[in-house]
């Protein structure tokens, strides 16, 4: 076992750099725990506010004897022109703060360099979020291998790789509505330019930041991916080949949350009493509930949220609807009460205003569908729980994930969203799916057609394969072993 080797011959020390956004930090904390369970000393470097988000989960891990420590560095907000209190990506109130935020984050290079000079034992490896290109300079200065973590699936990473190698494909498109086929792909898949992450050119300082991110990607030693071989074998194999063998699929990392409290508080403490939520679910028939959650950075316009609510109501099916970023949705709260919506659906609709215990909900036998924004964490959690998906992508890698879920894996139904919802421009787009469209999509997912039954069967099988992948002897468990052996050989050859 690698854990025995690391203790006896060479103590490995990994330093983890999560990006300051909820969807990026959650899996990175899981990765920290997975590696610590193998005897690797883990140091997580983050800012005070972000450290506080994971205090409970990490305290339990440390109390159980896992060798994890957190080092806090102050974000130089003022120096970067960022107003105080904007320590997380999901707390930014406007697009104008995006560049100052990234500037502040990458100004951490100097304090982190000082940390590395004093660290003991000397770090053997850096695992960095791809949004933190400054960690490449740290890795180079201290001659330490840097492993990248994107938080995306192999399907999406391979798509980005192919398009960067064949830039003329995007350059030759006549408009943002024109579709193109991704070449050299195991399946025929079409996209428009805005649907592909990092594909559109943005002028000025943001372009420079993106170029730094791409360059740091190219020069990293390898990549770890939160997926499992059995989920997307052709894409995992092709992406590994594209990375010269240095790509390790180690997921689903969420499965390290075996304790109920860890599942309930993964990412944030829930804004609903866990027992109240489970009691409500217990009262519903098996497979009857649709769980609706559009992520931590969803800011659909009020007009669209109303149509979603009315469609859920007209579907006549029980549902849980999570509205995060609640303070930004005061108008929706008013509509819930003023229109009578909350009163009308109270017997079969549970509204969670804030953070939900998502893993506990998805694992419950009464849940039979998941309406998701297709962020990779949520997508993978749904599949891992054996729940078919109703896809409603917004931006980033989410359209890639939808294509994988609906067209390749055939475990989901599209709500019909084709247009990218650019952050800060939601009102311009307006309603993309009306209440009839919502009702129809819910019926297609939750109904009793042959296709619906086949989707349920397929996703349950993929869920079982996920559980096997992380067990000893499984593909992801073995890949962690392989990664640690690789880094250990490097560490020994450097000393």
From Swiss-Prot:
<dbReference type="GO" id="GO:0035251">
    <property type="term" value="F:UDP-glucosyltransferase activity"/>
</dbReference>
<feature type="binding site">
    <location>
        <position position="398"/>
    </location>
    <ligand>
        <name>UDP-alpha-D-glucose</name>
    </ligand>
</feature>
<feature type="active site" description="Charge relay">
    <location>
        <position position="129"/>
    </location>
</feature>
<feature type="active site" description="Proton acceptor">
    <location>
        <position position="24"/>
    </location>
</feature>
<dbReference type="InterPro" id="IPR035595">
    <property type="entry name" value="UDP_glycos_trans_CS"/>
</dbReference>
<feature type="binding site">
    <location>
        <position position="377"/>
    </location>
    <ligand>
        <name>UDP-alpha-D-glucose</name>
    </ligand>
</feature>
<feature type="binding site">
    <location>
        <position position="396"/>
    </location>
    <ligand>
        <name>an anthocyanidin</name>
    </ligand>
</feature>
<dbReference type="Pfam" id="PF00201">
    <property type="entry name" value="UDPGT"/>
</dbReference>
<keyword id="KW-0808">Transferase</keyword>
<feature type="binding site">
    <location>
        <position position="378"/>
    </location>
    <ligand>
        <name>UDP-alpha-D-glucose</name>
    </ligand>
</feature>
<keyword id="KW-0328">Glycosyltransferase</keyword>
<protein>
    <recommendedName>
        <fullName>UDP-glycosyltransferase 1</fullName>
        <ecNumber>2.4.1.368</ecNumber>
    </recommendedName>
</protein>
<feature type="binding site">
    <location>
        <position position="376"/>
    </location>
    <ligand>
        <name>UDP-alpha-D-glucose</name>
    </ligand>
</feature>
<dbReference type="GO" id="GO:0016134">
    <property type="term" value="P:saponin metabolic process"/>
</dbReference>
<comment type="function">
    <text>The monoglucosylated hederagenin 3-O-beta-D-glucoside is a feeding deterrent of the yellow-striped flea beetle (Phyllotreta nemorum).</text>
</comment>
<feature type="binding site">
    <location>
        <position position="24"/>
    </location>
    <ligand>
        <name>an anthocyanidin</name>
    </ligand>
</feature>
<feature type="binding site">
    <location>
        <position position="381"/>
    </location>
    <ligand>
        <name>UDP-alpha-D-glucose</name>
    </ligand>
</feature>
<feature type="binding site">
    <location>
        <position position="397"/>
    </location>
    <ligand>
        <name>UDP-alpha-D-glucose</name>
    </ligand>
</feature>
<comment type="similarity">
    <text>Belongs to the UDP-glycosyltransferase family.</text>
</comment>
<dbReference type="InterPro" id="IPR002213">
    <property type="entry name" value="UDP_glucos_trans"/>
</dbReference>
<feature type="binding site">
    <location>
        <position position="358"/>
    </location>
    <ligand>
        <name>UDP-alpha-D-glucose</name>
    </ligand>
</feature>
<feature type="binding site">
    <location>
        <position position="373"/>
    </location>
    <ligand>
        <name>UDP-alpha-D-glucose</name>
    </ligand>
</feature>
């Amino acid at each position: 076992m690698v854990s025995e080797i690391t203790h006896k011959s060479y103590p490995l020390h990994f330093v983890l750099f999560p990006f300051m956004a909820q969807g990026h930090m959650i899996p990175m904390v899981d990765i920290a725990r997975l590696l610590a369970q193998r005897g690797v000393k883990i140091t997580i470097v983050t800012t005070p506010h972000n450290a506080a988000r994971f205090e409970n989960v990490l305290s339990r891990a440390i109390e159980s004897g896992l060798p994890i420590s957190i080092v806090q560095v102050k974000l130089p907000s003022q120096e970067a022109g960022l107003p105080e209190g904007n320590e997380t990506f999901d707390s930014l109130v406007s697009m104008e703060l995006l560049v100052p935020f990234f500037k502040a984050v990458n100004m951490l290079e100097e304090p982190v360099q000082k940390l590395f000079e004093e660290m003991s034992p000397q770090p053997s490896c850096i695992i960095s979020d791809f949004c933190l290109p400054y960690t490449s300079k740290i890795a180079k200065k201290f001659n330490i291998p840097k492993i990248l973590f994107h938080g995306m699936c192999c399907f999406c990473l391979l798509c980005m790789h192919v398009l960067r190698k064949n830039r003329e494909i995007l350059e030759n498109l006549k408009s943002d509505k024109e579709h193109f086929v991704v070449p050299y792909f195991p399946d025929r898949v079409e996209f428009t330019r805005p649907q592909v992450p990092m594909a559109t050119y943005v002028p000025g300082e943001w372009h420079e930041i993106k170029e730094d991110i791409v360059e740091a990607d190219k020069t990293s030693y390898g990549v770890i991916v939160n997926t499992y071989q059995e989920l997307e074998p052709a894409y995992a194999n092709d992406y590994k080949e594209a990375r010269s063998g240095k790509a390790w699929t180690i997921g689903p990392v969420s499965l390290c949350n075996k304790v109920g409290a860890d599942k309930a508080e993964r990412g944030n403490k829930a804004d609903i009493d866990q027992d109240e939520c489970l009691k409500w679910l217990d009262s519903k028939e098996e497979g009857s509930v649709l769980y609706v959650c559009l992520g931590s950075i969803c800011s659909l316009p009020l007009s669209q949220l109303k149509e979603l609510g009315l469609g859920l109501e007209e579907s006549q099916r029980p549902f849980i609807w999570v509205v995060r970023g609640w303070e930004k949705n005061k108008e929706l709260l008013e509509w819930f009460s003023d229109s009578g919506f909350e009163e009308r659906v109270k017997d079969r609709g549970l509204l969670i205003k804030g953070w939900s215990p998502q893993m506990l909900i998805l694992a419950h036998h009464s849940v039979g569908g998941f309406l998701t924004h297709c962020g990779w964490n949520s997508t993978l959690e749904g599949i891992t729980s054996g729940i078919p998906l109703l896809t409603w992508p917004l931006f980033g890698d989410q359209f890639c994930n939808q294509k994988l879920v609906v067209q390749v894996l055939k475990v989901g139904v599209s709500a019909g969203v084709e247009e990218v919802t650019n952050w800060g421009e939601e009102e311009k787009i307006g309603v993309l799916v009306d209440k009839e469209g919502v009702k129809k999509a819910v019926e297609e997912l939750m109904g009793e057609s042959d296709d619906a039954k086949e989707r349920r069967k397929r996703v349950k099988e993929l869920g079982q394969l996920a559980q096997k992948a992380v067990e000893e002897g499984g593909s992801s468990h073995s890949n962690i072993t392989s990664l640690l052996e690789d880094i250990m050989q490097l560490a020994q050859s450097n000393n």
